[in-house]
Amino acid sequence: TQASTRLVTVLGPGGIGKSTLAGLVTARLRGVFSDGVFEIPLAALTQADQIFPAIADATGLKPISEKPLPPQLFGHLGGKRILLILDNVEQLTENAQHFKAILDGAPSVRILTTSRERLNLQDEVVFRLDGLRVPADGHDGNNESVALFLRYALRANPLLTVDDNA
């Protein structure tokens, strides 16, 4: 994506590899974001009011309890080149405005989310992960899904023989 892109959602069904891809992105981009890349698992969160505290904790903010957290968080993140990787946000999509508030309050922050559902925010760029195609007759040895299956089957049993009737 372009340098101006600030919010990317890796979208796909459960188990497709969204979190794995996010982990690879983390490893690759650590040097690009001089103030840090923070992987923040959000699967356990169920309430909107848990979003800002989870991000504050992950990024090292020690909030002043008598002051509202959002302005403290935006001040803490503001001006820093940070990538927030927010993993498993699908149960929080109704509260996507919290993510927009972070982007608005901390203009140099970038966010990558993983989700089964879109956030439906205006500037969201969606990167969809889909499964491999399966041939209708199941006999296409050149098909990616069949080739992957055969590779693992042969790894498990090197003596396995495969023919067109298998």
Task: List the predicted regions and their residue ranges.
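Short amphipathic alpha-helical segments
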Residues: 96-100, 124-127
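Walker A/P-loop phosphate-binding element recognition
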Residues: 1-93, 100, 104-113, 131-132, ...
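Helix-loop-helix "sensor" segment of P-loop NTPases
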Residues: 61-67, 119-166
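Short, polar loop motifs at secondary-structure junctions
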Residues: 113-119
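Active-site-proximal flexible loops/turns
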Residues: 48, 94-95, 122, 138
